[in-house]
From Swiss-Prot:
PROSITE patterns the record matches: GNAT (PS51186)
Listed name of the protein: Amino-acid acetyltransferase
Gene3D superfamilies referenced in this protein's UniProt entry, alphabetically: 3.40.630.30, Acetylglutamate kinase-like
Assigned protein family: Belongs to the acetyltransferase family. ArgA subfamily.
Assembly behavior: Homohexamer.
Any Pfam family hit: AA_kinase
Gene encoding the protein: argA
Pathway noted in the entry: Amino-acid biosynthesis; L-arginine biosynthesis; N(2)-acetyl-L-ornithine from L-glutamate: step 1/4
Length: 441
């Protein structure tokens, strides 16, 4: 008898909305040389092939810093930098081109066979490289000639779009030519960032050695706004980190985000399946740089009723919440505040004001099981308390049978039935015997 896998079923159900949302979108993937050297790179390439098979338009940008440094060491060349930018003289340029060319051939070959030994074996992936980027020299700075180190002059985004629309993966590296036919060494973060901006990409994705950006406790920070990310960059650079995958990607992500790229994702190249988990799960696995959070706290609308019902039904069945019908919710929806993450309602609460007595009830407080160890309840309490103050209310009360200590830890004090508004006293259920707690606003 075959075994049933409920985890597979649940995972597929959760991923389907993201499969639909990502189809037809353009993603720019930045692969640093460190990621290419790692043992997990074959799995990353296979996952890139899987994304392509799902109808996602992909531009892959690869870097070659460790490969270039290894080439220089082999040929007894000492790398030179000015203001943390490599100086690429003619001899160095030849070694840069050699390293970049070998990587291009290797990545192309791997992508071409990425769907082998999968149910999609036989599906053809067309990988295209070309002179989509025109470069120009960095020039001379403080009397230092950067020689063949360059920057992007322009991108032929229309040509890139044509290749993407024809079903190809576009592969670009750190070497580009100028209008005079010279070759220049570019940084992979500049190439990936400018491509993401010019192509109006939905996402830019980068790989680093860790799972993302961590806080002081070592926990992954799931979201950063550009200003917060810039602060992280400043701290890393002050510590002497100018070239790690994390700092290079964050520099590009901040610029991309401020230029219209909705989300930039930083994930680990060491974790098998990190790319898929980041893109096809609600909470991901790494760090996102975003202009607007994937999670919103807002007033509920009539379109939120289904999500609220799905959230509160299990609690009603356990007797934790008083049952509410759909009709009642429709009539009272303007009283509700919701926390929504990627179109899933993960928390809700309602405020029922009694203005004659300057008091309000916080009711129907519910948080999705996956988020109860986080601060969503506190977010709701802060929002509902702010709404109560705006309405001129001086106190907030709750009736609870299971969350007494949670509310007391946040300043609520025990009270008697007589302290409730007159209308609420008349409706108090003595059989349920809910505890009454009051917060002075």
């Amino acid at each position: 008898m075959k075994e049933r896998s409920t985890e597979l079923v649940q995972g597929f159900r959760h991923s389907v909305p993201y499969i639909n949302a990502h189809r037809g979108k353009t993603f720019v993937i930045m692969l640093g040389g460190e990621a290419i050297e790692h043992a997990n790179f074959s799995s990353i390439v296979n996952d890139i092939g899987l994304l392509h098979s799902l109808g996602i338009k992909l531009v892959v940008v690869y870097g070659a810093r460790p490969q270039i440094d290894a080439n220089l060491t082999t040929h007894h060349y000492e790398p030179h930098y000015h203001k943390n930018t490599r100086i690429t003289d003619s001899a160095t340029l030849e070694l840069v081109k050699q390293a970049a060319g070998m990587l291009q051939l290797d990545i192309t070959a791997r992508l071409s066979m990425s769907l082998n030994n999968t149910p999609l074996q036989g599906a053809h992936i067309n990988v295209v490289s070309g002179n989509f980027i025109i470069a120009q020299p960095l020039g001379v700075d403080d009397g230092v000639d950067y020689c063949h180190s360059g920057r992007i002059r322009r991108i032929d985004e229309e040509a890139v779009h044509r290749q993407l629309n024809s079903g190809a993966i576009v592969l670009l590296g750190p070497v580009a030519v100028s209008v005079t036919g010279e070759s220049f060494n570019l940084t992979s973060e500049e190439v990936a960032t400018q491509l993401a901006i010019k192509l109006k990409a939905e996402k830019m994705i980068g790989f680093c050695s860790s799972q993302g950006v961590t806080n002081e406790e070592g926990r992954i920070i799931s979201e950063l706004f550009p200003d917060d990310a810039q602060q992280r960059i400043d701290v890393l650079e002050q510590a002497g980190d100018y070239h790690s995958g994390t700092v290079r990607f964050l520099r590009g992500a901040v610029k991309a985000c401020r230029s219209g790229v909705r989300r930039s994702h930083l994930i680990s190249y060491q974790d098998d399946g990190a790319l898929l988990q980041e893109l096809f799960s609600r909470d991901g696995i790494g760090t996102q740089i975003v202009m607007e959070s994937a999670e919103q706290v807002r007033r509920a609308t009539i379109n939120d009723i289904g999500g609220i019902l799905e959230l509160i039904r299990p609690l009603e069945e356990q007797g934790i919440l008083v049952r509410r019908s759909r009709e009642q919710l429709e009539m009272e929806i303007d009283k509700f505040t919701v926390v929504v993450r990627d179109n899933l309602t993960i928390a809700c609460a309602a405020l029922y004001p009694f203005p004659e007595e300057s008091i309000g009830e916080m009711a129907c407080v519910a948080v999705h099981p996956d988020y109860r160890s986080s601060s969503r309840g506190d977010m709701l309490l802060m929002r509902v308390a702010a709404q109560a103050r705006q309405q001129g209310l001086q106190k907030l009360f709750v009736l609870t049978t299971h969350s007494i200590h949670w509310f007391q830890e946040r300043g609520f004090l025990p009270a008697e039935v007589e302290m409730l508004p007159k209308k609420k006293q008349a409706l108090y259920n003595y059989q349920r015997r809910s505890k009454i707690l009051v917060l002075d606003l």
